[in-house]
A protein has these predicted regions:
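Hot-dog-fold acyl-thioester-processing enzymes
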Residues: 1-72
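HotDog/MaoC-like acyl-thioester-processing domains
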Residues: 2-3, 77-129
């Protein structure tokens, strides 16, 4: 169960993430995108989910990742991601509730290129009862 004092906390990701053209090309091919001069908007969910797992499974946070399913996603894009970018990620646990025994957690992820905010994304994560 999520530790109640985790709500409202922001956690920094461990490392910067370097974006390669081959990663963009592979992701674009899977979703049928042909223009790979910039990363498709949903490309960054891979970064966010990796960071969420690292953050939310910390002992002081207490979420059981093995029972987690992804419920919803939205993005706010400020700048395009492209090959050669080095991005840092932070995640904020914005809300938490229990419904029918399931834990529902809303997490905002902010990706930065240096000091510039590139993308904010919000994920609703459900930890099954």
């Amino acid at each position: 169960m999520l530790a109640p004092d985790s709500v409202g906390r922001t956690f920094a990701g461990a490392d910067s993430i370097s974006i390669t053209q081959s990663e963009i090309d592979a992701f674009a091919a899977v979703i049928g995108e042909t223009d790979t001069t910039i990363a498709p908007p949903t490309f960054t969910i891979r970064i966010s989910l990796d960071q969420f797992q690292n953050i939310l499974t910390r002992p002081e946070v207490g979420l059981d990742w093995s029972r987690l399913v992804h419920g919803d996603q939205k993005f706010e894009i400020f700048s395009h991601v492209k090959a050669g970018d080095s991005l840092s990620c932070s995640a904020t646990i914005e809300s938490y509730r229990v419904a029918a025994g399931n834990e529902i957690v809303s997490v905002r992820s902010d990706l930065h290129r240096g000091e510039e905010l590139v993308i904010s994304s919000w994920s609703t994560l459900v930890v099954r009862a």
